[in-house]
Amino acid sequence: MGYTAAVAGASGYVGGELLRLLLAHPDIEIGALTAGGNAGTRLGEHHPHLTPLADRILTETTPETLAGHDIVFLALPHGHSAALAAQLDADTLIVDCGADFRLADAAAWQKFYGSEHAGTWPYGLPELPGARAALAQTRRIAVPGCYPTCGTLALMPAFAEQLVEPEVVVVAASGTSGAGKAAKPHLIASEVMGSVSVYGVGGAHRHNPEFVQNLSAVAETPVRVSFTPVLVPMPRGILATCSAPLKPAIGLDEVRAAYQRHYDAEPFVHLLPEGQWPTTAMTLGANTAAVQVTVDEAAGRLVAVAAIDNLTKGTAGGAIQSANLALGLPETTGLPMTGVAP
């Protein structure tokens, strides 16, 4: 049985990546393509690489346009999904690539996003404990943020097996596409090229409470997270370097064994051989995460590094992976496992 899918926010980076992946999906037919200010224009004006869809006209994002599809992917700015989703049929599979339904803590949502909390949907990171079962029974999916996807995959086995103390430092470098497609002075080429900068320092980034939520759930105890994002001059990709204090008598053998237990059967998470470290180039265009872990014996700390493509595994690919599970399809359906090189 085939399914039809609408993409709301099709002119943006996430919308474009969804369409690139959906074009290769054997069980999903692309339906309505909608946009905000770009409604009425050709898709090819915004995504010239999507040749098969180049002449499709973007329509306004309304409940009427999205109705009648089996799946609706929402690639909208934060805070715009909840009202629209409330007007769609309960049987429609809605996959929200924004932040509206990620956080369970209403106070955390209000603190970091400044609006009324819309609620919580099943969280679309299948690799988390219990996530696949929850996704298989839902018609509403909240796609994780790109930074929490990367950092959570770097750290999850260590917290799941109680190898580290409940505190962690995450420093994650990301390309500029993570900030979206809208023009911003600090993202123009003359500002970004040749420069590396931090932002959202001191726990101010909106993904901070998502890290806390994920890792605390895995560890089954509150985890303190110090997260610093770094903007680097490349279009896409995230490299997260994470460090946490090891519990007594934990060494590298125990750590690697834990990561192997958790990731050997995961189709999209690759634990690299000892001595090989993740790079963003490894995952470019693929729905994969490259992970490596070691022990800093002098500091008594675990060091875990992960790389993903922020638009693929970090958003659009993760959205389709979760949708596959909700539809009863193999979760790898239509998703690339190999990156693009050089």
Swiss-Prot record:
<comment type="pathway">
    <text>Amino-acid biosynthesis; L-arginine biosynthesis; N(2)-acetyl-L-ornithine from L-glutamate: step 3/4.</text>
</comment>
<dbReference type="GO" id="GO:0005737">
    <property type="term" value="C:cytoplasm"/>
</dbReference>
<dbReference type="InterPro" id="IPR036291">
    <property type="entry name" value="NAD(P)-bd_dom_sf"/>
</dbReference>
<dbReference type="GO" id="GO:0070401">
    <property type="term" value="F:NADP+ binding"/>
</dbReference>
<dbReference type="Pfam" id="PF01118">
    <property type="entry name" value="Semialdhyde_dh"/>
</dbReference>
<protein>
    <recommendedName>
        <fullName>N-acetyl-gamma-glutamyl-phosphate reductase</fullName>
        <ecNumber>1.2.1.38</ecNumber>
    </recommendedName>
</protein>
<keyword id="KW-0560">Oxidoreductase</keyword>
<dbReference type="Pfam" id="PF22698">
    <property type="entry name" value="Semialdhyde_dhC_1"/>
</dbReference>
<comment type="similarity">
    <text>Belongs to the NAGSA dehydrogenase family. Type 1 subfamily.</text>
</comment>
<keyword id="KW-0963">Cytoplasm</keyword>
<dbReference type="GO" id="GO:0003942">
    <property type="term" value="F:N-acetyl-gamma-glutamyl-phosphate reductase activity"/>
</dbReference>
<dbReference type="GO" id="GO:0051287">
    <property type="term" value="F:NAD binding"/>
</dbReference>
<feature type="active site">
    <location>
        <position position="146"/>
    </location>
</feature>
<dbReference type="InterPro" id="IPR000706">
    <property type="entry name" value="AGPR_type-1"/>
</dbReference>
<comment type="function">
    <text>Catalyzes the NADPH-dependent reduction of N-acetyl-5-glutamyl phosphate to yield N-acetyl-L-glutamate 5-semialdehyde.</text>
</comment>
<dbReference type="InterPro" id="IPR023013">
    <property type="entry name" value="AGPR_AS"/>
</dbReference>
<keyword id="KW-0055">Arginine biosynthesis</keyword>
<keyword id="KW-0521">NADP</keyword>
<dbReference type="GO" id="GO:0006526">
    <property type="term" value="P:L-arginine biosynthetic process"/>
</dbReference>
<dbReference type="InterPro" id="IPR050085">
    <property type="entry name" value="NAGSA_dehydrogenase"/>
</dbReference>
<dbReference type="InterPro" id="IPR000534">
    <property type="entry name" value="Semialdehyde_DH_NAD-bd"/>
</dbReference>
<keyword id="KW-0028">Amino-acid biosynthesis</keyword>
